């Protein structure tokens, strides 16, 4: 008799747990009906960089999520396009710049990115002055 009561209690507990898991799965399905989200660019709340928002749409649903635009991003190719860059090339004497090429490593949030990009920067002069005046301690 005692074994039968224990068995019924265990069976009842199993049913309760199973129904709770089923309800949880149902809630997840309702919230994730949309599978193809289209995300816009991250728009900083103030200035050119820092914290901001990104809007996403899927059918009639719209979501707004927090995002961050790094302050060292290059506007030409966007903050959501991540590139792997080669080493800087030699200095071009006629233009006074050096260049390197980057290949697309990752496009975040379905961003439209170029496969390869080329960036330039001014050549730096080789002669940098490293001499600094040393301050003596109070003897004049």
From Swiss-Prot:
UniProt keyword Signal present: yes
Induction: By retinoic acid. Induced after tissue damage. Induced by inflammatory cells, in particular, CD4(+) T cells under inflammatory conditions. Induced during the early and intermediate phase of fracture repair.
Subcellular location: Secreted
Gene knockout outcome: Homozygous knockout MDK mice are viable and reproduce normally. Mice have no apparent abnormalities except that postnatal development of the hippocampus is delayed. However 4 weeks after birth, mice have a deficit in their working memory and have an increased anxiety. Knockout MDK mice exhibit low to moderate levels of auditory deficits and generally respond at around 50 dB. PTN and MDK double knockoutmice have a deficit of auditory response.
Cysteine pairs bridged by disulfides in the record: 34-58, 42-67, 49-71, 81-113, 91-123
Effect of substituting residue 105 to Q: Does not affect binding with PTPRZ1. Does not affect binding with PTPRZ1. Does not affect positive regulation of neuron migration
Coiled coil (UniProt feature): none
Documented effect of changing residue 100 to Q: Decreases affinity binding to PTPRZ1. Decreases affinity binding to PTPRZ1. Decreases neuron migration. Decreases neuron migration
Annotated site (Required for high affinity binding to PTRZ1 by interacting with the chondroitin sulfate chains of PTRZ1): 100
Any Gene Ontology CC annotation: cell projection
InterPro entries: Midkine_heparin-bd_GF (IPR000762), PTN/MK_C_dom (IPR020090), PTN/MK_C_dom_sf (IPR038130), PTN/MK_diS_sf (IPR020091), PTN/MK_N_dom (IPR020089), PTN/MK_N_dom_sf (IPR037122), PTN_MK_heparin-bd_GF_CS (IPR020092)
Signal peptide location: 1-22
Function, as annotated: Secreted protein that functions as a cytokine and growth factor and mediates its signal through cell-surface proteoglycan and non-proteoglycan receptors. Binds cell-surface proteoglycan receptors via their chondroitin sulfate (CS) groups. Thereby regulates many processes like inflammatory response, cell proliferation, cell adhesion, cell growth, cell survival, tissue regeneration, cell differentiation and cell migration. Participates in inflammatory processes by exerting two different activities.
Name under which the protein is recorded: Midkine
Lineage: Eukaryota, Metazoa, Chordata, Craniata, Vertebrata
Gene this protein is translated from: Mdk
